[in-house]
Structure formats: C-alpha cells, structure tokens
UniProtKB/Swiss-Prot annotation:
GO cellular component: plasma membrane
Pfam families: FtsK_alpha, FtsK_gamma, FtsK_SpoIIIE
Ranges of compositional bias, category Acidic residues: 715-726
Subunit architecture: Homohexamer. Forms a ring that surrounds DNA.
Source organism of the structure: Streptococcus pyogenes serotype M1
Regions that span the bilayer: 31-53, 58-80, 89-111, 131-150, 155-177
CDD domains: TrwB_TraG_TraD_VirD4
Record-given protein name: DNA translocase FtsK
Length: 801
C-alpha cells in the first residue's frame, strides 16, 4: 500500500513551454547549420580526400554549378528567417537555378564530343571518372539534376530550344525575386521603347541635317573652284599698255621689253637683279643679302610700274608683294569648329544662396565680422567677394581656408586676399559641375584684335568675360602643370588661334615635341619652318638654329637702321611700293616646346643656354617662345629660365612647392584640373584665374586639313638641325656627357689644382648640369685621378699637379 502511494506521489516529467521548445529547436538548427557549413567549406576548398570527394558528390547532383549551389546553401543556412520573410525569394532562386542547370547542360551537349552520347550515361560517365580519380577536371554541365531536366526539354524543343527554355526559367526566377509586378515591367519596357524611338528619330534628323550641310559645302567648294578658275583665266589675259584693253595672246603686239615676260611664269628675282645704276634704294645690296634668296614666285608687276609714267598717273600705285603661293590663301573660319553645347548652371544659383549664409555663419563662429558683397558664378568656380569689418586682419581670413572648405563641403577653397584693385577679399569655391568653355564660344566672344596676329583668346575669367593675351607683349610664355590638367589643350588652342589669323608668310612655327604625339598633327602645314622635331638630341640644335636666326636678324636691323621687326617690315613695304624689285617681310617665329623636362634631361646646358639667349633678345627680332612642361621642378625651370620667361600659365599641380616654382607663389595646388588655370602675364603682379577653352582633336584635325588642302609645306633648310649621333659632344642618354667628354681635361685640371673633387664643385666651376657632373666624376675615377666614393666622406685625389 505504501509502495502504491509512493508510486502515485512521483510527479510526471515537467512539460516544456513553447518558448523552451523553440529555443531547443534553434540550438539544434544552429548546430546542424554549423556542421553543414563546415562540410560545405571543406567541399568548396577541396581540402584533402574528404573535401574532393564531397565536392564531386555535389557535382554529381548539380554539375559545374557546384560552387554557386554551395554558396547559396550557405546563405540559406544563416539567413533562413530573413529569406522566409521575403515573399517568393526562395522560389525565385530555385527556379532561376533550375534554368541555369538547363543552360549548362545544353552547353555541354552542344560540344562535338557529346553529340552522340546518351544524356544520362554520358553525364554519369564524366562525373564518375573524376570521382574515382579524386580530381576535378571535366566540365559536367548541370550534373544529373541538369540531365533530368534537359532530356525532356531537348526532346521537345531540341538543343537550341533548350537555351530559350532555360532563359525563360531564369527570367521567371528573377521576376519572383524582385518586388516588381507585371505592370511595372510592361511600363518600363514601354518607356524604353519610346526613348529608343525618340532617339532614332533625333538621329535620323541629325543625319539629314549633316547630309544637307555636306551638300551645301560641296556646292560652296564648287563655286569657289569656279571663281578661282575665273581669276586664273583673267590673270592670264594680256592688257595693252597703250589702250588699256584686253587682247588675245596671239594679237598682242606690245613693243616694250617686258611684254614677253607677261606670258611666262614670273621669274624668281633677287633684290638687286635689275636695279638701274641711277636708282636710289632704301637698302644696299649687302643689307638684304641675309633675306631669303629663294622666296617663291611673285606677280610680275614691272609692267604696271613701267606703264605708270606712260599713263601719266599722279597717284602712287599700291603694290602687293605677297608670295604668289599665298595670294589665294584663305584663313580658316570658325565654322570648322564644333558648335558649343548649352550649359545649365541653375543648380549653382541655388547653391550660391545657401553658401552665402554658410560663409557668414562660419566667419561669425570664429569671431570675424564679414559681409558677402557679391558672388560671381564662373565656369569652374564661384567667387564670393566679402568685405571684412574695420579692424579685421586679412591674415585671419586667409588662415581659414581649410575650415571654410569643411563648412562648404568643397574640394578646396582658394582665398585671394585682397582682390587687386578692390577693398574686398575673394573666396573661390569649386562649382558642383564644371562648365566646359569651347574654343568656338571663346573665339566668338573674344574682343581680340584680328590685326594682332599673336593675340589669342585664352579662357574665361570667373566673371564670365573672355580674356585674351598678346604673345608679342609677353614676350615668352611658360606653361606648366601636372599630367591631365589641360596643358596640351591650351597649347593647341594657342596654335589654332594663330592659324586662324595668320598666313604662312606672316607667322612661322618651330615645334618641338619629344613625346611625339601632341604636336605631330601639325606636320606638313605651310606655317612650319621644319617638320615637328621629336628627337630630343635634334631639338637642342634646332633651338641653336633659332638663335642664329635671331643674330642674323639683329645684324640686318643694324645695317638698315631699325630697332625691331616692325620697323624692318615697314621699310620693306616702303621699298616695295617704290621699286620694281620686291622683298618679302620677315615673318614672326613662334617656338613651341611641349615637354621641356625631356630636353633638359638630354642636353640641359645647351637647351638652357639657347632658351636664355632667346628670352633675353628675341622679342625685338619677332621670335617668341612657348615652353610647356609637366614637371615644374627647379632642375627643369631654372632661375635663369624663369627670369627670362616672365609670363607664366600654371595648371593644377600636386604641391605648393611646384606652384611657387611656376608662379613664385602658392595657388596652383588648389586648381581643379580640366583647364582650370592661373595666368600671370608680365604686366600683372598677381595671377588671374581662368577656365581655359577646350578644343578637341577633331577640331584641330579639321583646321589642319583645311590649311593643307590649300597649299603644301615649304620647309626652310636653314633651320634643319641635321642628323645627330650618340658621339656628339654634350649629349648622352642619361643626361650627361658622352664618352670622351670635351670637358674632361678641364675637370681634371680643376681637381688637380684644388685637390678637391665633388660633383657640386664641377657644376659650379664648369657650368654643367648635375648628371653631366656626376658622369665627369665617374670618368675621373676610371682615369685614376680620384678615388672611389666613401659614403659621406669627400673623395681622395690620387694625383698631383
């Protein structure tokens, strides 16, 4: 009885609550997930025999899609709850994966080696081969599951049709995974089709307009050709000097001596070939001996001059002494350039109102009382002009550049304190979008004088006004900036501007392009003195040829009694107006070096000497330089070069040191690139910020082809640098002297005299670059004059005088 009561008293097991049951299930699920994840990781990494075998077993099921399958399984294990909350996500993934299995198996049985194989047996044979050999080498399509799906689909729709079925499965799966409904998809497709239709219609209209432009251009060229033929026919007609009537060549009976010459090609005459003894000229024979002896054909104007006395004309006859090859030369028109696209800066206006408030609040937080007077929206930056209160020091505002950039969320802020000519301080903040300034837009808005051949539009200031500069007043220009900052585009814009104004007989170019790609497009234009120089060794000699030309011109000016090229050309015009013998004016010469750093590495002394001499004297001789470099360091832009090239154009650089090398002040390190520049001409103390014009390669090619179609290049052999070799004195590939340096004996004598040897001493005493000085030190060591380098200790001199 007692035992029965004890049995009754033993309480049954405590039933778990629902929360505890769920917790145990979650723990079991987590343990299983971790074990399964470890299994999958071993299989994915194929670790040992177990990993390879497990991987091949999964390949047996899903084939070569084993990796995506295992990765999706891992995501499912740890994101189960999240996936359950997404309606259709799991179903979409499964359906899309089945479509991929069909695609993979269709690709497998499209291979030639599987065409006559049974689908199940062929697939199993491939997988079993890898499974037994413990390797993974064969492409097995979608595995046995893929074979199971592919066989009925291929039977019903063929192998090609199975691709479409698999693709439909994938689309259906993606559709289930995304929150789109059928209406959204149809609406999206309809909008895309409408946009394509509109784009097609616009493209069709553009093609029609382009065809019409080509047709009109062809008609224009035909009319111009007809007019040229008419001018040529009229030029060949003979005028009777007594009656002034036009007569046929066969009926012409002119009795004076020069009548026969009227029907022949004009003869190339030197200045003094037919001067009479009693004629008084403005020049002596020796004075113009330097002038080009072969200057091309001239119009035969002697008949006109002879008939002047017979016709008793009191008024002087105006003569044209332009070479015949350039009489019909037409300057390029602005229509050759692509039209500029409209710019929308409405966002900037809204941003300016906000920034004005931010600026005033920021200054107020630092205890500085200022007021924003005005804001000017430029192409690349917006300039806020602020007026500080009385007693506020300017440097307090200048020191807040970084704080202002932080407050305005700007890339960088440049402070101009103060603005030249104003009692205001300028704060330049980059725009959210840079508005491109096209060359055509700048040319049309520029007020440059067309009579000034070297006055070219350069860019737009912050206030939107076009700015021009006259290279003749510069008189030389240094262009420097990092790679991709817009330096080469600016040089192309300057060249194109000059080509738009000047005939080949008015301006000549010498272009030096060691990079071989920037200026080569200008080859064969008649404005070139010689082809574009791409060899750095030849460039040094070419610059020396320009120096020789400068000296020759000064000798000519001295004999004539004029001070500059303008005075000389005026004398030529007066002489040609009063004499039958015609002389051609001297053209302006523009020397363009696109990469100065490369030249300084090859022949620094020769290049620097030539640049310095041209910088000191070439202005009056009508010779101007444009020097461009992407490495604005002091070993490239030396102090003497800076002193003789006073006008500077700085693009974006990496540091304030480079900015000071170019402009002698900071600022260029805060530029934005893409044509954003600081321009400091010779007549201004502070640089001006401009957005340079953009000229595309297509625009340059069009203007070059327009010029080439009119006339051919006529190079001047006097400027040809000739051939160079590795043994030329003063050159070497590493920037020093070649073997057998001509300064070796001088360096040896210097070392023996001072009993000291250092590269810096040779640099100072022999005026050579560092690379050449170190090369001389190596040669002195090889000759046994000095000992080897001993760290920081000076070298020992082994010989005595």
């Amino acid at each position: 009885m007692v035992k029965r009561n004890q049995r009754k008293k033993s309480a049954p097991k405590k039933r778990l609550t629902k929360a505890e049951v769920e917790k145990q299930r979650a723990i079991k699920r987590m343990i299983l997930s971790v074990l399964m994840a470890l299994l999958l990781i071993f299989a994915m990494l194929r670790l040992g025999v177990f990993g390879v075998t497990t991987y091949n077993m999964i390949r047996f099921l899903v084939g070569s899609l084993a990796y995506p399958f295992m990765f999706a399984w891992l995501i499912y294990l740890f994101c189960f709850k999240w996936l359950r909350q997404k309606d259709g996500m799991i179903a979409g993934v499964v359906i899309a994966f089945l479509g991929l299995l069909v695609e993979w198996h269709a690709f497998l049985f499209a291979m030639p080696r599987m065409l006559d194989q049974d689908i199940f047996l062929g697939t199993a044979r491939l997988i079993t081969r890898d499974l037994l050999a413990l390797r993974v080498t064969e492409f097995v399509g979608g595995g046995m599951l893929g074979a199971l799906l592919y066989k009925p689909i291929a039977f019903l729709f063929s192998n090609i049709g199975s691709y479409f079925i698999g693709f439909l499965f994938i689309l259906l799966g993606l559709f289930l995974m995304t929150p789109w409904d059928i209406y959204d998809v149809s609406h999206f497709v309809k909008e895309a089709v409408d946009k394509l239709a509109v784009a097609y219609q616009e493209n069709k209209e553009k093609r029609f307009i382009k065809r019409e432009e080509h047709r009109l251009q062809a008609e224009k060229e035909a009319l111009e050709k007809q007019a040229q033929e008419e001018e040529k026919r009229l030029a060949e007609l003979t005028v009777d000097p007594e009656t002034g009537e036009i007569v046929e060549d066969s009926q012409s009976q002119v009795s004076y001596d020069l009548a026969e010459d009227m029907t022949k090609e004009p003869e190339i005459l030197a200045y003094d070939s037919h001067l009479k003894d009693d004629e008084t000229s403005l020049f002596d024979q020796e004075d113009l001996a330097y002038a080009h002896e072969e200057i091309g054909a001239y119009d035969s104007l002697s008949a006109l001059a002879s008939s002047e006395d017979e016709m008793d004309m009191d008024e002087p006859v105006e003569v044209d002494f332009t070479p015949k090859t350039h009489l019909l030369y037409k300057l390029p028109t602005i229509d050759l350039f692509a039209p500029d696209k409209p710019k929308n800066q409405s966002k900037e206006k809204n941003l300016v109102r906000k920034n004005i408030k931010v600026l005033e609040d920021t200054f107020q937080s630092f205890g500085i009382d200022v007021k924003v007077e005005r804001a000017e929206i430029g192409p690349s930056v917006t300039k806020y002009e602020i007026k500080p209160a009385v007693g506020v020091r300017v440097n307090r505002i200048s020191n807040l550049a970084d704080d202002l950039a932080l407050a305005l969320a700007a890339k960088d802020v440049r402070i101009e304190a103060p603005i030249p000519g104003k009692s205001l301080i300028g704060i330049e903040v980059p725009n959210s979008e840079i508005a491109t300034v096209s060359f055509r837009e700048l040319w049309e808005q520029s007020d440059a004088n067309p009579e000034n051949l070297l006055e070219v539009p350069l860019g737009k200031a912050v206030n939107g006004n076009a700015r021009s500069f006259n290279l003749a007043r510069m008189p030389h220009l240094l262009v420097a900036g990092s790679t991709g900052s817009g330096k080469s585009v600016a040089v192309n814009g300057i060249i194109s501007s000059i080509l738009m104004k000047a005939r080949p007989d008015q301006v000549k170019f010498m272009m030096i392009d060691p990079k071989m790609v920037e200026l080569s497009v200008y080859n064969d234009i008649p404005h070139l003195l010689i082809p574009v120089v791409t060899n750095p060794r030849k460039a040094s000699k070419a610059l020396q040829k320009v120096v020789d030309e400068m000296e020759n011109r000064y000798e000519l000016f001295s004999k004539i009694g004029v001070r500059n090229i303008a005075g000389y050309n005026t004398k030529v015009e007066e002489f040609n107006a009063s004499s039958e013998q015609k002389q051609i004016p001297l053209p302006l010469i523009v020397v363009i070096v696109d990469e100065l750093a490369d030249l300084m590495m090859v022949a620094s002394k020769e290049v620097e000497d030539a640049i310095i001499r041209l910088g000191q004297k070439a202005r009056a001789a009508g010779i101007h330089m444009i020097l461009a470099t992407q490495r604005p360091s002091v070993d490239v832009i030396s102090g003497l070069i800076k002193a003789n090239v006073p006008s500077r154009m700085a693009f974006a650089v990496s540091s304030g040191t480079d900015s000071r090398t170019i402009l002698d002040e900071n600022g260029a390190e805060k530029l934005l690139g893409r044509g954003d520049m600081l321009f400091k001409p010779i007549d201004e103390n502070h640089p001006v910020r401009l957005q340079g014009s953009f000229i595309s390669d297509d625009d340059v090619e069009r203007i070059v082809n327009f010029i080439k179609d009119q006339t051919e290049a006529d190079y001047d052999d006097a400027f040809d640098p000739g051939e160079v070799s590795d043994n030329d004195p003063g050159f070497s590939g590493n920037g020093g002297a070649a073997e057998g340096d001509p300064l070796f004996e001088e360096a040896k004598a210097l070392v023996l005299e001072t009993q000291k040897a250092s590269a810096s001493m040779i640099q100072r005493r022999l005026s050579v670059g560092f690379n050449r000085a170190t090369r001389l030190m190596d040669e002195l060591e090889e000759a046994g004059v000095i000992g080897p380098a001993e760290g920081t200790k000076p070298r020992k001199v082994l010989q005595t005088n």
